[in-house]
Every structure is written in structure tokens, then in C-alpha cells.
Amino acid sequence: MARRQDEQRGGAPLIAEGKSDAEVKLILYHWTHSFSSQKVRLVIAEKALKCEEHDVSLPLSEHNEPWFMRLNSTGEVPVLIHGENIICEATQIIDYLEQTFLDEKTPRLMPDKGSMYYPRVQHYRELLDSLPMDAYTHGCILHPELTVDSMIPAYATTRIRSQIGNTESELKKLAEENPDLQEAYIAKQKRLKSKLLDHDNVKYLKKILDELEKVLDQVETELQRRNEETPEEGRQPWLCGESFTLADVSLAVTLHRLKFLGFARRNWGNGKRPNLETYYERVLKRKTFNKVLGHVNNILISAVLPTAFRVAKKRAPKVLGTTLVVGLLAGMGYFAFMLFRKRLGSMILALRPRPNYF
């Protein structure tokens, strides 16, 4: 549910009298590679809404900074500001956008409640949104043996384990430094600790991956129904019908994340769930999807480089001017390039012609 702000925060404008919802600026605080943020940004793109976006870097712990915790006491992205309204949590933001922008020029992603398609879209949206994506993400990093062709580098396992300890210490320190946010920081610390205990449990991970397969079986069956309902000369359908809906937003972003994590080959391809495979290939060609999420092979490099620039900007002493900034950027850029080159090298080796001795 949207809440009102008593004063301007983060540069958010108060609603001006006489202005329509469409005329009031939308401001989104997000992280480009956050799963929840991607769903919201895809909805904004599909609805062709104008929105001012601010990247809140999770690797740099910007979501734990006091200014952001005052926007959202859970310290999680995304957060949407629309005039005096502050809306947190992806599902609530998406519902707010769908219920607020009702003019004829703005595409609707949810059928009318009286429509035969409404319960179908709502069912698959709720089913897909209930998947524990944070557990899949942390789990594949902590236990890469459960994945195949994961695009997350091996060093990340050690890195995330050390970062967990650092984050707990950081939250404790922030709680002491900001008495007004003490409860919020302590609550976040407890949630983090509880989640990561589960996410580091192999038995739990195997259980939720088995449950994921059952969900994807339902999706595969639904996609097959769409194919059977559609005449040969008809338009190719989406998950719940001819239109791209909120159920498709959830499914498209989920499949893209599973591909990045290394769970794609386990769930589709090589004759397994062919409708799901065809659906994902079609989604990749969708203009709005490419604009928001891009190619799966570019996710790692597009996460590293902006973070490198932010680190350089934050740490560079002003007295030394641009020389140090350029140096830091070059160093961090080189680090990102080396990560990219390592993956590219393996691709080149695979394509290199083998000598023929016969």
C-alpha cells in the first residue's frame, strides 16, 4: 500500500494542485540487476511510462544507507515515489502503476476483473511471484555444484561468505549511529541471518529446486494449451492469451534469472519443456525486454563496470582531481575486462578448429 510523505525526500516532488497522475513525475530507486527491480522496470517499459531512475547499488551497500532506510525501513529495492506517495515492494509498485495510469494511451497489463482471462493471469502471477528467487540466487553462489553453466564466477562463493559477515557488522554499526533507525537495522540484520542460514542449506535448496520444476511443469502445460487454442494462421499467444500481461512479466524475468544462475539446462532445452524454451527465445526478441534486461551474457560485465565507476567517484580525493579518478577507473575497468576476457577466452577455445591427423 502506498504511504504519503510529509516532506520531500530524495528530491521527490510533492503533488501540485490540478495535476493529473500522468503529469506528476515518477521516481524509481532501484538496482539494475535486482530481480524485483527488473520486474518493475519491465512494467514501466511495457506501459511506456516516463520515469526518473536512480540506481541504488547493492554491491556498495547503498540500500543500507540511512537516507534509503528512511524511504523504506526494510532497506530493499525497488522504491517508487509518485508525488506524495511512497510505494515499496515490487508487487505493490506494479499494482499501483496498473491502477493509477488508466488513460487509453497506456497499455493495460492486467485484464478487467470480469474478464475470463483475469483469474488465469492472477493465478500465474501469484504462482511465479511466490518463487524464492533470493534463495536460488544465494544458493547457486554458495553451492555452485547445483548449477550448470552458471555465469557467476567461482570466486564469488568466497567473496559472498566474507561479505555476509561484513554486512552484519555494518548493520550493527549503522544501528548505533542512527538511533531513529535502530529497530529497522536490527530487524534487517535478523532477517539477513535467518535467510542465509536457509540459503546455505543444500537440502533446502534441493527441495525448492524440485518445487520450481513443478511450477514450470504447470507453465509448460499452460503454454501447450495456448498453442492448441491458436489456429495456424493466428497470432502467437503469450502465457495467458494473446496479450503480454503481468503473468508474462513474472515469467520472462524469472526465466532470464534462472538462465544467468545456471538453472536453465536443468529446466528446459534438449527436448525438455519445449514450449518453455520457445517462449524464452521469443521473450529475448521483445524490444522492451531487451531494453530493460539485455542479453544474459552481458549481465556480469554490466554489473561490474557501473560499480567500478561509483567506487572511483566516492573514493577519489578532490585535491588530486581527475588524474586519480581516471586511474581508479582504469584499474577497476581492467578488473572487469579480465573477468569478461576469461569467459570470452573459453568461448574462443571452443570455436577453434582442431587439427586433423587423418
From Swiss-Prot:
InterPro entries: Glutathione-S-Trfase_C-like (IPR010987), Glutathione-S-Trfase_C_sf (IPR036282), Glutathione_S-Trfase (IPR040079), Glutathione_S-Trfase_N (IPR004045), GST_C_GDAP1 (IPR034336), Thioredoxin-like_sf (IPR036249). Keywords: Acetylation, Coiled coil, Cytoplasm, Isopeptide bond, Membrane, Mitochondrion, Mitochondrion outer membrane, Transmembrane, Transmembrane helix, Ubl conjugation. The chain crosses the membrane at residues 292-312, 320-340. There is a cross-link at K50, K172, K173, K188, K190, K203, K206, K207, K214 (Glycyl lysine isopeptide (Lys-Gly) (interchain with G-Cter in ubiquitin)). GO terms for cellular component: cytosol; mitochondrial outer membrane. Its main location: mitochondrion. GO terms for biological process: mitochondrial fission; mitochondrial fusion; protein targeting to mitochondrion; response to retinoic acid. SUPFAM superfamilies: GST C-terminal domain-like, Thioredoxin-like. Residues 153-309 form the GST C-terminal domain. Ubiquitinated by PRKN during mitophagy, leading to its degradation and enhancement of mitophagy. Deubiquitinated by USP30. Residues 320-358 are annotated as: Required for mitochondrial localization. It is a multi-pass membrane protein. It holds the Pfam family GST_C_2. It is found in: Mitochondrion outer membrane; Cytoplasm. The modification N6-acetyllysine is found at K203. Homodimer. Regulates the mitochondrial network by promoting mitochondrial fission. Belongs to the GST superfamily. PANTHER family: GANGLIOSIDE-INDUCED DIFFERENTIATION-ASSOCIATED PROTEIN 1, GDAP1, ISOFORM A. This is Ganglioside-induced differentiation-associated protein 1. The gene is GDAP1.
